[in-house]
């Protein structure tokens, strides 16, 4: 069994914001798997699905970004899952917009949701699907930038990026992060 976590903030006011791209990917992954977020546990919305041979819980923590790790840590402990069973999808300021990268471990890059997950699972050594949102314009607070909404004209690029992130997540679940990284990151570099 695997746990896939899309990071974001609950509430309609955060829909379509850069910071909620993890929720968008989780929603699309569940939709493609024919699953719905019908369960509520660990202060999160959960959808049970199958990705290839793997049973997967897709999670959207409802604790707000800075406390996302509470739900993730509780779920890992409850289901007795290890860090190699965890895939977290989140926005990333350090990646160019619409670029998708898969990595294991590394720093949190100032992302409070990732910081919280690291603190509650005891390590950064889990798979992360990083979805690039780019850097804010000069003199703009990064918090204001990530809480800003994607522009209407960005729909096609965002949709393609979400599909790439869904595929990266699926590969991480089905192949394991190490094998999946070769495919996902090679594709991402080829798109440059």
Curated annotation (Swiss-Prot):
The gene is pth. PANTHER family: PEPTIDYL-TRNA HYDROLASE. GO terms for cellular component: cytoplasm. Its EC number is 3.1.1.29. The record marks 91 as: Stabilizes the basic form of H active site to accept a proton. It catalyses: an N-acyl-L-alpha-aminoacyl-tRNA + H2O = an N-acyl-L-amino acid + a tRNA + H(+). Belongs to the PTH family. This is Peptidyl-tRNA hydrolase. Signal peptide: none annotated. One of its GO terms (molecular function) is peptidyl-tRNA hydrolase activity. The keyword Hydrolase applies. The active site is at residue 19. TRNA binds at residues 14, 64, 66, 112. The record marks 9 as: Discriminates between blocked and unblocked aminoacyl-tRNA. One of its GO terms (biological process) is rescue of stalled ribosome. Monomer. Hydrolyzes ribosome-free peptidyl-tRNAs (with 1 or more amino acids incorporated), which drop off the ribosome during protein synthesis, or as a result of ribosome stalling. Catalyzes the release of premature peptidyl moieties from peptidyl-tRNA molecules trapped in stalled 50S ribosomal subunits, and thus maintains levels of free tRNAs and 50S ribosomes. It is found in: Cytoplasm. CDD domains: PTH. Keywords: Cytoplasm, Hydrolase, RNA-binding, tRNA-binding. It comes from Anaeromyxobacter dehalogenans (strain 2CP-1 / ATCC BAA-258).
